[in-house]
Amino acid sequence: MDVEIKEYAGFVQNEWVRGVASLWMTHPGDGAIVLSGDAGCGKSHAVGQLIEAFSRMGFAECVNITATTHKAVGVLKQPSCTTYQSSLMASIDMCQANFEEFKCLFDARHRQAIEMWDRIVSNRTGLAAVKKGHSCVTLNMRCPVCVATIHESIRCTDKPYPYFIARTMFIIDEYGILSELSLKKILYALSKFKLPGQGYILVFTGSVSQLPSPEHPQIWQTPLLRDMIINTYSLFINFRVEDAAYAEAINLFQFNVITRPAVEMLNARVIGANAVDAEYCDSVTRIFNGNRERDAYNTRHTMVMEGRGAGRVDLTPVIEHVGGSASCRFGALIEYMCSTVPKIFNKATKGKRTVYEGGYVFVLPTQERYTFFGLDDVNTAVVGREDGRLYLERQITKYKGWTVSFFPIFPVAAINTYSAQGETLDRVIYAPPEKNYSMSSIRASAYVACTRVRTRTAIELSCNSFAKSVGRTNMFPEKLLNHKKSVEMGYVPRECPY
């Protein structure tokens, strides 16, 4: 990238940070800001700059940095970052509940904090005067001194309280995965901890150009989001483009456009049956649309590793029933583990995984890729890469009379496109469905898979079933594209005067 372009990109990010900070300080009520852009345009960097700016100005206690997935949390690399569910202290039951059930569960779980908040609201003038030399006449959630006073008061409750309280700069990365129900739950939680005339600024970063949430309506389908938005901005300079022609061709998939360069480049990368041959470039991660194809490849890869004499290690979780009045059945425990750690637990294997020394694994929660070296002892797994080794202890989960301990790693020979989201990989082999790709329920998978790499030479395909000819395609719904153009990119439709 040219130095001048890089400097301009930095200027654009700094201006966005300045604008967001100014809006937050001058707009005491609720609102939303959307920051979008293609992969590599610096959204995570801009968010990091925003957090640094708030820290320099003394507003660190006013910021709540979250993401929709554990993977996105890892990508942000911010020490205080959690999933938005963790910030709300939402249990698995609350995450799975409908809206009415969620309200009851939230109120019950945070009853003490809500009652304390009501007392804070009633005494907001007196609390503002607690700190000597403090000029606020009443508590102000845009003032760091007032926010610190609020947090000190909330800490007086016997139970833990949600982290987000009074942190009115509420950032949510990878917002495109949210559903209308998720947004309603977030807004309900915020509504319980407001001061009169004061609210929260939600900063949504990411894009709707990704695989959809299983919940409907999705975030782009609800007027609830549109009604909240105060400002949107789309970053447009890509920092990691090493193959500009490839990047431009694949980025047009977002707009359901297939160009001639896209067809020619992808056709040239087809390797046929080698894509699913576990002995062909076995160190390269395979990406499949479906779990069945992924699992079949992983089985073949297992056979290859055993044939080479690689050391086999069975990772079996330790499950103990400690009992108690609230104890649940074993089946209910497994259902809970499947919903909270789906990468490791499923009903068939119940958390048992087979990995091989010298093979590749993903480490939770960040899903970063490492080489598996073996077990140091019964409770310590050793993984590593070029920058050193990492010693992993078993992760412990307690649930209704049970204790489950397991290693937070899973094999990575092949993954599905949902797991691939957010990854940047050195090389990828993508095996899409050969027939009727346009009938798939996750047609955006091709865009996800092709954007995991920086250059055309870093991707190989079993077939090019998704970009066979120049013209229009249907990777994304038209209404989603309308949201992207108007909300994320700020396009204003106008009628042609001619």
From Swiss-Prot:
InterPro entries: P-loop_NTPase (IPR027417). The keyword Transport does not apply. Keywords: ATP-binding, Helicase, Hydrolase, Nucleotide-binding. SUPFAM superfamilies: P-loop containing nucleoside triphosphate hydrolases (SSF52540). Its EC number is 3.6.4.-. It comes from the Viruses. GO terms for molecular function: ATP binding; helicase activity; hydrolase activity. The keyword rRNA-binding does not apply. ATP binds at residues 37-44. It is an enzyme of class 3 (hydrolase). This is Probable ATP-dependent helicase 25. The lineage of its organism: Viruses, Duplodnaviria, Heunggongvirae, Peploviricota, Herviviricetes.
